[in-house]
Amino acid sequence: DTLIEKRFKDPDLSDKNKKAFRVGYGLGVDHVGGTPVLQVPDKPDNDEVFLDGNSAVALGAASAGCNYITAYPMSPGTGVFTFFAKNAKLFSAVVEQVEDEISAINMVVGAAYAGARAMTTTSGGGFVLMCEGLSLAGITETPVVVHLAQRPGPATGLATRTEQADLELALYAGHGEFPRALYAPVNVES
């Protein structure tokens, strides 16, 4: 109740939101057999960090010296870009949202060619559009980082049978033979 009252100052609006929360929560409890839908543990009294995978990728990139990121938002990779945007000043990074994925990869190639530690982030459908720019990076021997947030199936949504289609696409993306390094983390440590 305290969180809802803090968010909604008007008593009438606060009461309506508390009622809506209780109804929704009750439906969730009934649906999963009497246990809460989501249990958030108390904050531990230590230096542990609680964050999602996209934030971890963004922090890792910033720690590695990434100082330029450009992207066209595409879930599930958008979180990396928005985390960078929110912390651009802290990371001393240039953050640029562009009109499409083709522009994003070409700007990353240009920035890297000029000496920036540059990256972009996307998902399968956006990565398909980046393949020609990836070929440009290959022919000019310009190192770029593309965060490809893998979807659970061959397109947006959840397929009947899941697969690693985005990873398969990344193995052979671009024209011609040039070196590629693919990293697919399997747990928090990697």
What name fits each language-model region?
Residues 12-19, 125-128, 189-190:
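Active-site glycine- and acidic-residue-rich loops that bind
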Residues 68, 75-172:
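Thiamine diphosphate
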